[in-house]
Amino acid sequence: LSYLAAEKNLADGKEDLALGGKTAANPGYLGTYNEYSGTKVGKLSAYNAGLLKFKEGKYQEAYDLLEKFSSKNKILMALKYGAMADCQINLNKNEDALSLLDKASSASDDPYTSYYFTRKAGLVSLALKKNAEAKKYFSAIDEKYQDYDNGMSDSYIEMVKYY
């Protein structure tokens, strides 16, 4: 019931109430996770709370909550790793972020999800001046995900030469 109340609060734009954890009457995602951490709903509550903490700019708290989430759903796991990577980027831990983006890009069989995180890993590699690694990611896009790319991977591969 507490998870459903948190979902309703989130749908109504009441993010603070959805996050909850401040009173027993409104446990929100945090309280639901704390009470039911070993269950699927508890783990999903940690994921949702992590996303809300990220939105608040509390990146370490968000990362810690996201880390507690697990699922057999491969797309959700890819999204988890991607969100954790965003936390690490905001904490200036770009090497860790790149590792998480690599995990995100291969966590799911969904082509768009894989494309999205492969592209992001390529861009982070470029920012870290890891041109060979960036080229690897952009070449993978060119080979596997042309339907989603609109020819941009060729531009990125060319950019690697001069960046």
Provide a role label for each language-model segment.
Residues 1-163:
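Acidic, polar-rich low-complexity tracts and alpha-helical solenoid repeat scaffolds
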